[in-house]
Amino acid sequence: MRASRPAVHPVEAAPPPPAAAAEGPEAQVEGAAHPRGVRMKDPPGAPGTPAGLGLRLAQAFFAAAALAVMASTNDFPSVSAFSYLVAAAILQCLWSLLLAFVDIYALLVKRSLRNARAVCIFTIGDGITGTITLGAACASAGITVLIGNDLNICAENHCASFETATALAFISWFALAPSCILNFWSMASR
């Protein structure tokens, strides 16, 4: 029989054993071990938790801010590293917003995102977007240092905007790193 498996599973608490309730509070303390097969709660920052949603929204916000600051300059297309930063910020913003919507759905229906396939997709996506965002931020930082410190041509360029966009891209990556690590840990601990 083929049956579909949803990406979100209900979180159900196991009822207390009837024998412990009948014996009194002393028996409850002694038999306080969790029954076999009960999982611990999702760690803060995992998909489907309020902290996970906060991390996703922070990722999207800082990526969108980096995109807006870089796009506000008229000469960013002349440097390939800055164009790469814009493309990476767009990808990061879209990925983070997509997963934020998944987190919102899971929170609204009070479900946990513990499906192995979903966690694997989240981990791979976070790893790819994180690598791209970090690479773009590092490349932009290198060009910004070259323009500002080595060539001393900040007078005719938007160095402050370039530095701000680069810093925002790094902050977006720092918000992505805990999500990626928690997803990888969750996937590896299965």
Swiss-Prot record:
Region (Disordered): 1-31
Oligomer and partners: Homodimer and heterodimers.
The keyword Cell membrane appears for this protein: yes
Membrane-related topology note: Multi-pass membrane protein
InterPro entries, alphabetized: CASP_dom, CASPL-5
Classification lineage: Eukaryota, Viridiplantae, Streptophyta, Embryophyta, Tracheophyta
Extracellular membrane side: 72-81, 148-164
Listed name of the protein: CASP-like protein 5A3
Taxonomic source organism: Zea mays
Feature: compositional bias, Low complexity: 1-12, 20-31
Subcellular location(s) per record: Cell membrane
Highest rank taxon of the organism: Eukaryota
Record-annotated membrane-spanning stretches: 51-71, 82-102, 127-147, 165-185
Keywords for this protein: Cell membrane, Membrane, Transmembrane, Transmembrane helix
Entry-linked Pfam families: CASP_dom
Keyword Glycoprotein: no
Gene Ontology cellular component list: membrane; plasma membrane
Cytoplasmic compartment segments: 1-50, 103-126, 186-190
Family: Belongs to the Casparian strip membrane proteins (CASP) family.
